[in-house]
Amino acid sequence: MWRFKKDRSLESSIAYMCGALVITAGVGACLLRGLFFTEEMYPFLTLWFVLCCTCSLYYLVGVGAWRKSGGGAVSGITGVNGVSEGSEGSEVSGENKALRILLSVPLIILSLYVIHWLRGPLSSQGTMNEMLRWGLYASFALLVCFCAVNRVGRRIVNVTWSMAGMFLSMSALLAVCGVVKLPFAVAYSNSSEVSATGVRLAGLMEYPNAFGAVMAVFLLERLFAVAVYYGEPKKSVNMLGARSVGLGMECAEAERRSKGAGGVEAEQGKAGSTTAALLRLLPLFPYTAALLLSESRGAWLTAACACAAVLLWKRQLIAPLLAAGAAPVAAAALLYRQLARAGLAVEPVPGLLLLAGLWAGALLAGLWLCRRQRSAAGTARAAMLALAAAGWTAAGIAVLLHVRERITGPSSTVSARGLFYRDAWRLAAEAPWLGRGGETWRHAYLAAQSRPYVGSQVHNGYLDILLNLGFVGLAAILLMLLATGWLLATKSPRLLPPFMVIVLHSVVDFDWSYGLFWLLLFWLPALALAEDKQKHQSAPTHPQSETKLPIQSTSTNPLTNVSTQANPLIAQSTSTNPLTNVTTPTNPLIAYPTPKKSPQIRLRQLIGTTVCCFSLLLGVLSFHAAQGEKFYRQAIMSVDPSVKVELLQQSLGWNPRSPRTVIALSRLLSGEQSVSLLRQSLLYSPENASLSWELAERWMSSDHPGAALYWIDQSFRLDKYNNAKWVKAIEGMLLMGQKKLAEGNRKEGLVCVASGNELLLEYRRLAEEEANKGGQHNDREFQMTEQADDLSRRLSMLALRF
C-alpha cells in the first residue's frame, strides 16, 4: 500500500507539471496573438523549453529513485490500452498505431528542419523559427496526451480548452463593446469584396479569417457535445455527463450532486441539473456571435461542410443539434445585424446590455428547446423541431442577406490566391522532395511571383509545408492527419467536425502559420482520449465477474513498444491483486520502472535523456534569439548612432542569422565593413533580396561599376517588381557614368551610361507588360514613374554629348 501511494504521488506530480505546461501553452497562444509572430514568441519559447527540461529531469530522477528503492510500477490511469470493454486486439493495436503516429510526426518534422538547418537552407533564420515552433508542437502533443489519460490531467485538459475558447471569444466581443482595449481587434476595409460592412472582428488574433476559423472549431466542439448529450436516452446520466468534455466536466459534477432522495435534496438536485445544463449551453452564443462577426466566408463554409459530413454519418444527432443551436444562432444573428450596422463600435453600457440580454435569452430558450426535444414525442416534438428549424432559417437569411454581395459577386481574393498557388507550385518544383527550409514562401515569393502582388503568406497550409519540407514533409503531415481523424472517429466522433474545420480551412488560408491551430489540432485527440477514458471509468463494473473471468489481453505501449498486460475491466494498478489474481493495465504514456534494468528501460532512459537535452538545446537557441531581438528593438528606439551601432552589434552577437539586423547595422558602418558584413550574412540567407540590394547600393557608391551591375542583377532576379529599386539603379549608373566622364575616363563612363539605358529599357518593358495585364493584382503599383522618365531624358542627353 505504501509503495502504491508513493507511485501514485509520483504520477500525480508529473501530471500536475504536464497540466501546468498545457495551461501555459493555452495562455501563451491567447496572449501572443495566436502564436503568429515568432519574434515575440522567443521569451515564451525559452520559458517553455526550460519547463519541459525541468519536467523531464524530474521524471528521470523520480523514476530512477523508485527503481533503486525497489518501488513498484508507477500506477496510473489506463490510456489507450484497454480502454474499451470487450475491445479486440486489432482495435487496440490500431489505436496504439494512430497515437504513435500522432506523437511521432511532429518529431519527424522537427528533424527535417534540423537537417535543413545543418545543410544550409534558403533562410537560416526562418528554419530556426520553424525548429522552435515544432519543438513546441511536439512537446505539447506529448504533454497533452499524457494529461488526457490521467485523472488529474484530464480535468486540466478539458477546462483549459473551454477557458481558451471563452477567453478568445469574450475578449473580442468585449472589445467591440468598448470594455476591453484591443487595438487591432477590429479590422477595417474600404473594399466591399473584403467586408460587406467595412468592419470585421479579428479578436486577439488580429486576422478575421483565422479568428473565424478558431471560433468555428470551438463552436462545433461544443455544439456537437450538447447534441450528443441530448441525443442519448435520459438515463445513464453519469456516462452522458462524461461524454461532454470541457465545461461538461463541471456539468457531470453538478449532475452527480443532483442525486437526492426528496425534500431539500430533490430541490438541490433539480437546481444542480439546471445549472449543469446552462453550463453546457453557455459558450454557444459567444462562439457563434464571434464567428458571424468575423465575416469569414471560408470559416462559415468549412463549418457547414464539416457539420453536413458528420450529420450524414450520425443522423440521430440532427434533431438534438437543431434544438441546441437554434436559439444561440438566432440570437447571434440578431447581435451581428445590430453591431454590423453600428460598425462594431458601440457604447459600453448599451453594448453590454445588448450582449447580456441576447445571451440570457439564448441560454433560456436553448435550454427549453433541448429539454423539449428530449422529452416530447409525436406532434409536440415535431412542432418543437419545426420551431428550431425556423430559428436556424431566420438566422441564416438575416446573415446571408447582409453579405449576399460578398458571396454571390466576383471575388478578387479568390483569383489572387489562385495566382499564389500557381507561383508556389513552380517554386516547389525547384526542390520537390525535401523543400528549401523554413519560411520559404516568405523569403522567396518576391522572386517567384508572376505579378506584382503583396502576399508573404501563401494562403494554403499544405503548400506551405510542401515548400518548406517537400513531399516528404507533406506526406508526414497527411499521415498524421489521417491518424488523428481515425482516432477521433473511433473514440469520439463528435470531435470530427472541429477537426475537419482545421483540415479544410487550412486549404484556403494560412491557418498553420498560427501556432494556435497546431495546438488545437493536437488538443482534439487528447480530448477524445480523455472523454473515452472518463466514459469507461464511469461505466458500472461487476467485481464478482471480474474475479471469475479475469480477461487479459496483450497490448503494446505506443511510445516504448513494450508489451504489457491489459485488462479492460480494471484500471487500478499494474501490480497483481492477491484477492482476484487479476493483472491490471498500464499507462501507455509513462515508463514503468521495474527492479531489473531491462534493455527497454535503458532505451526509455535514453529517450528521456535525449528529450531533456534537446529541450535544453532549443531553450538555449530561443534564449539567444530573444536576446538578439531585445537588443535590436532597443537599437531601433535609440537616436544616438554610436549607441545604435553598439546595440546592433550585441544583437548580432546573440543572433547572427537575422537579415534585418545586418541591414540596419550595415547602413551605419563604413564601406568595407558594410560590404563584409553583408557578404557574411548572405551565408545564412543566400537569396535574400534585401541583402543583395544593400550590396548593390554599396557598390554603386564606389568606383566599381562591374560589381554594382552584378549585385543589381542579383537583386532584380530576386525582386523585379520594385519601382524604387529600378529608379535607384538607373540613377546610380547615371551618376557613376557622370563621375567617370568628369574624371576623363570616357570608356568606363560610356559603359555606365549604356548600362543605365539597358536597365531603363528593361524597366519600361516590364511596366508595359504589367499595364497590358490590367490593374488587378498590381498591389505594388508597378509602373513607369515620372522620375524614371526624367532619368531617361538625362541619359539621352548625356549619350548625345559624348
Where are these regions (language model features)?
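Membrane-interfacial, low-structure loops and terminal tails that flank and connect transmembrane helices
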Residues: 2-11, 66-98, 230-279, 374-381, ...
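Hydrophobic alpha-helical transmembrane segments in integral membrane proteins
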Residues: 397-416, 605-642
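TM-adjacent membrane-interface loops and short helices in multi-pass inner/ER membrane proteins
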Residues: 207, 418-456, 462-465, 469-476
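A juxtamembrane structural motif centered on a specific transmembrane helix
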Residues: 2-15, 235-239, 274, 330-336, ...
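Extracytoplasmic loop-helix module adjacent to an early transmembrane segment
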Residues: 47, 51, 183-192, 411-431
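Alpha-helical transmembrane segments of multi-pass inner-membrane proteins
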Residues: 2-33, 47-59, 110-117, 129-143, ...
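C-terminal luminal/periplasmic domains and tails of membrane-associated envelope-modifying transferases
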Residues: 631-802
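Transmembrane alpha-helix boundary signature
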Residues: 57-71, 95-98, 114-126, 176, ...
